[in-house]
C-alpha cells in the first residue's frame, strides 16, 4: 500500500466519523463477503506450517479489503471526479503505450528484443495489458456522458486494440474482446435497428471466432530434420558464431530452431538453404525465433506459437500454454488430497513442489510455479468455501452491473471472472491492488449512482 493510503487510514483512525463509516458499511453489505474471504485466509494460518509465506500472502491480499473499506467508508465519489480521474487514466495509458512502443522499437533495432514481455517497460506485461483493455469501457462511458467526441473514442479504441493485439497477451486480448462485446451490446440495446445490428454483430463475431479456431486447430505442415547434420553444421558455422548443436538465446535447441525457421520459409532443410539465409534471418534464429512472423511480433506470432504447442511440442518447458496445463494438473492433484479446508495459505508452494516431485513432472525447477488460476490457488489454500466466496463476490458484482446498466462494473466483473482462470490475480500486490481499487470506486452505493447518472 502507498504512503498516502496509510496516512489516509491513520487520519481516519484519529479523527474519522465512525458512525458514518458504520452506516456506509451496512449499506454496502457485500463488503462482508470481502471480509469473510480475507478472514478465511487468515484462519488458514492455523493449519499452515510455513507462517512466513502465509503472512506474506495475507499482506498482499489485504489490499483487496482495505481499499474498498477505506474508500467506501470515508469518501463520496462525485460524477465530476469520475470524469476527471478517467481522463487522467486515459492520458497516462496513452503516454505509457507510446513509451513502451518506443522502448521496444529501440530493443528491436539493437537486436535485444527476445520476448514480447519486454514491451512493458514499467511493470507487469499482463496487468498493464488488462488495464489497457479495460480502459476501453471507461472511454465509452465518457462518450456516453458526452464528455469526449466520437472521433476521440474511435481513435482511442483503435489505439488500445492495436496495442493489445501486438502485445500477444491472451488475458488482455480476452479482456478487450469482452469490452467490445459489452460496448456492442449497449449500442445495440439503444438503437431502433437493434435486431438487424445484433444479428450482424453475432455473425461477424461468430465467423471471426470460427476462423480463429480453425487456424489454431489446423496443424502446421510436418517439419523434418536436416538432410545431413554434418553439412548443416559446417554451413551454419560459416554464418554464425553459435554452434548449431548449442542453445539459442532463449535456451532452446538451436538446431530445432533453425529447422523450424527454414520450414516456416518453405525451403529445404539443407546446407544450401542455410547459406541463402540473410543476416537478419541468422540473427532471428540465434535469438530463438522460429519464423519471421515470430520475430516481428503481433497476433500471428502468437497463433503460430499456440499451434506449435498444441500439435507438436512434447516438452512443456518454455511453452506458456503447456506449462499452464502442467500447473493446473498439479494443482488439481493437491486439491484432491485436501478438498475441504485446503493446505493453508502458507503451504501452497510447498504442496505444489511436493506434488511436482511425486508425479515426476518434466517441468524444470525454475518453471515449477503456482497454478496460474486464482480459483485453483484459492481452493488449494483455504478449501471449497474460499472458492465459493470468490465466485459469489464476482458474480454479485456482475449481476449488479447488469441490473443497474452499470457497464463499467459489468465489464470489470466479466474481465476479473475470466482472467482469474488464467492468472493468480490476487497473488501479487499489483493484482490485488488493481482489483481492490476498482471494487472501491465502482461498487459502492454512492459510486454506483455517480457512475450511472446520465448528464445528457
Please annotate each region the language model reported.
Residues 1-43, 77-87, 142-151, 193-200, ...:
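Transmembrane signal-anchor hairpin modules in multi-pass inner-membrane enzymes, especially those
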Residues 1-3, 56-60, 119-133, 168-171, ...:
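Membrane-interface micro-motifs in multi-pass membrane enzymes
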Residues 5-11, 64-73, 127-141, 436-442:
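Hydrophobic cores of alpha-helical transmembrane segments in multi-pass inner/ER membrane proteins
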Residues 6-12, 180-183, 194-199, 390-393, ...:
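Transmembrane alpha-helices of multi-pass inner-membrane enzymes
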Residues 9, 42, 83-113, 122-252, ...:
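Alpha-helical transmembrane segments of multi-pass inner-membrane proteins
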Residues 30-37, 51-75, 88, 93, ...:
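Aromatic-anchored transmembrane helix interface
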Residues 308-337, 341-382:
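Long extracytoplasmic/lumenal interhelical loops at the membrane interface
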Residues 381-414:
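Hydrophobic transmembrane alpha-helices and their immediate junctions
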